[in-house]
């Protein structure tokens, strides 16, 4: 069972096992989307996810569509997950971070406080987004992105280590990062170099 105290749960919402939901969270209520016309849609929360005070997670827009938050996530106070977002497993959203509609956050992502993620943006697995970042384009896996607008500033070495990624793989990722972001090569040339070196 999950612990839910003085929070609002909308219809067609599923809460996984051993979740903790703190006061004044709103989960599965109607989306803040002018396209929504009252259709039956869903909000699904995985197991062992912690949802802190004043978090809002909207259900989806579109008949039969869903908003989903995975297992073992931590959504700190005042975070927002908009309609049709898909949040993977082991994701941390720091205080007041917000996902606009249809955003995708893959596994083991950390999003800093007050960061804003634009609609339809995808953040790749094991990435880290800095606090107050304005994310308007997709963020590749394994990197750190920060700024307004956010740009890739480095490899998320600490996150990769914590995720149990082997040292050999981390070394290859570091080399690939240098080729893509630091060499000055065009993308096609960078791909050629990686095929030669890795």
Language-model segments: what does each one mean?
Residues 26-41, 62-63:
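Acidic/polar low-complexity surface segments
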Residues 39-56, 64-80, 92-101, 107-112, ...:
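C-terminal segments of enzyme domains that contribute to small-molecule binding surfaces
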Residues 9-11, 41:
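Extracellular beta-strand-rich solenoid/capping regions of secreted or surface-exposed proteins
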Residues 145:
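Divalent-metal (often Zn2+) His-rich catalytic cores of metallo-beta-lactamase-fold enzymes
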Residues 12, 33, 66-67, 84-85, ...:
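A short, glycine- and basic residue-enriched loop/turn
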Residues 110-141:
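A contiguous pocket-lining binding segment that forms or flanks enzyme active sites
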Residues 1-6:
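Short, small-residue-biased leader/transition segments that mark boundaries at the very start
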């Amino acid at each position: 069972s999950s612990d839910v105290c003085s929070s609002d749960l909308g219809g067609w919402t599923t809460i996984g096992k051993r979740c903790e939901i703190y006061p004044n969270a709103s989960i599965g209520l109607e989306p803040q989307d002018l396209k929504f016309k009252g259709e039956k849609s869903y909000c699904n929360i995985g197991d062992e996810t912690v949802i802190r005070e004043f978090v809002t997670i909207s259900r989806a827009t579109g008949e039969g569509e869903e908003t989903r938050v995975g297992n073992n996530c931590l959504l700190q106070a005042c975070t927002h997950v908009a309609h049709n977002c898909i949040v993977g497993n082991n994701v941390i959203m720091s205080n007041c971070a917000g996902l606009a509609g249809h955003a995708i956050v893959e596994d083991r992502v950390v999003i800093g406080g007050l960061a804003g993620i634009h609609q339809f943006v995808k953040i790749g697995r094991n990435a880290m987004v800095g606090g107050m970042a304005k994310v308007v384009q997709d963020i590749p896996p394994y990197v750190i992105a920060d700024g307004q607008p956010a740009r890739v500033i480095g490899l998320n070495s600490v996150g990769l280590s914590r995720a149990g990624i082997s040292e050999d793989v981390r070394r290859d990722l570091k080399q690939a990062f240098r080729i893509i972001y630091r060499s000055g090569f065009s993308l096609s040339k960078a791909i050629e170099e990686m095929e030669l070196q890795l």
